[in-house]
Amino acid sequence: MTAIIQQIKERFSQSLVKSFGENFADTDPLIVAASNPRFGDYQCNISLSLAKELKQKPREVAATLLKNLEIDDLCQTPEIAGPGFINLTLKPSYLETQLKDLITDNRLGVATANPSQKIIVDFSSPNIAKEMHVGHLRSTIIGDCIARILEFRHHQVIRLNHVGDWGTQFGMLITYLQEAYPSALTQADALDLGDLVSFYKKAKIRFDEDENFKETARQAVVKLQSGDPQSRQAWQLLCQQSRREFQKIYDILDIKLTERGESFYNPYLEAVIRELDQQGLLTEDNGALCVFLDGFTNKEGEPLPLIVKKSDGGYNYATTDLAAICYRVREDKAERIIYVTDAGQANHFAQVFQVAKKAGFLPDNVAVVHVAFGLVLGEDGKKLKTRSGETVKLQELLDQAIACSLADLEKRLASEEREETGDFIAKTAETVGLSAVKYADLSQNRHSNYVFSYDKMLNLQGNTAPYMLYAYARVQSISREGGINFQDLSANSSLILKDESELILAKQLLQLPEVISAVEEDLLPNRLCDYLYELSKKYNRFYENCPVLKAAEPIKTSRLFLCDLTARTLKLGLSLLGIPVLERM
């Protein structure tokens, strides 16, 4: 199904050509959703921007457009408002036809991408020998949501986990473990990840304070990089231990990822330097090899270079990221590469992308996007920390969310004097708890910081996961109470939209394709959350104002269709956020 806004655009594009000639065939008619329902459903703003070019008043341009506009089957008579806006109100008969098409459409009107693209989404990316913390939450959840939406649109998506599995920290850790716990370097599972993290912190202190230790650690890195068998075995054991712990969290959150860590690109680093040199882009600065960039300066206003090879001959994150771009473009054949990391890395990626374009690693037909996000804050407005000032571990945060959800559920069951099985309580608490964490993050504009609050995210009122899940469960309760299987409703039955609440709900249901298209373009998942929240509110108003099971036919079946379409839209939308629905709560 073509999105409603796209259908309207096509009609106005035809009118532009009829009214003002073929020169206007590619002119965007500037159709937007109406800012206020009092003015209709959509608005055309092209008259104001064309007036100067056509040397006419905006209202005259609007009148000419309407004269040649064929839109009677979609809209009521358009109205010219203010200086030249054209207000459009959809016809109930058109809404009924469009909704009828959705009844047998599993995709609920969302078309598949044409053409489909090969897209890489790079997200999560924790560091080996460190536990995942709250900072990884946003990258993991936002990246997964973006990947789900692109996959639903039938793009070919590669989900990559660019784990930090290489570098000086391994020489440091291996050197320390050789002294303190040598069995960890030869035996699988000799340590758990928490112990590894503790040893890593101690190793870092030794590295910073003990010159002999620092030199031994550097030699250990050289041995590792040169392929020394014992060093490689120790490194692989450390990676495997971390990997197993990461996977536990990915399984809990239902995250699918292909690991391709920093070490994967080691064989390609020297070739990157060679290509940059061949193109005359390298400059030596204090023994390091750099690329000077346009528009980047330090505090003194001096040109700021991107270092790609350190003075000691080692490589850095920039070199690895350039090698990754080369591989993703040349081997993966990616047409769009999306990096989901915190906003603090914006400058780094801007520099890397510029070098990649200068060097020809990034052709014009490949888009690279940094999906930046803000911080997770505590209720004190500061970066979320434990009481002791430590970074909050992601596993502990998720466990606490489930515990809070369980406490809320048990309290509600007691107040309702309801008895449920242990399995029901455990599953519901886990689903609601984890969904609340995901939704609280995704419902925020990712550019902003947000305050993490269990109380707010688990609230049954407001823009929260429990509110959405409850709206879905409420529809299913109609099915149970009426002994109705929505799938048994005849697709040949009529859809009748008379009540204002029905019309408002119908219009919201039909906006899903526009919303999915917008999120695919601007990569802002909160748009989908906002849509689902509005849908839930409009359904609740419909439920309050329009009897369903007590209505006479054919109104009853028509309203049952609206209920079913609402439930299906909520289920689909929530699944794209990585949230499963519950039939009962």
Curated annotation (Swiss-Prot):
Give the CC-aspect GO terms.
Answer: cytoplasm
Q: Which GO molecular-function terms appear in the entry?
A: arginine-tRNA ligase activity; ATP binding
- This protein's name: Arginine--tRNA ligase
Catalytic activity entry: tRNA(Arg) + L-arginine + ATP = L-arginyl-tRNA(Arg) + AMP + diphosphate
Q: Which terms are listed as keywords in the entry?
A: Aminoacyl-tRNA synthetase, ATP-binding, Cytoplasm, Ligase, Nucleotide-binding, Protein biosynthesis
Q: Please name the taxonomic classification of the source.
A: Bacteria, Bacillati, Cyanobacteriota, Cyanophyceae, Oscillatoriophycideae
Annotated family: Belongs to the class-I aminoacyl-tRNA synthetase family.
Cross-referenced NCBIfam families, in alphabetical order? argS
Pfam families per the UniProt record, alphabetical: Arg_tRNA_synt_N, DALR_1, tRNA-synt_1d
Q: Which organism is it from?
A: Microcystis aeruginosa (strain NIES-843 / IAM M-2473)
Q: How does it assemble?
A: Monomer.
Motif extent ('HIGH' region): 126-136
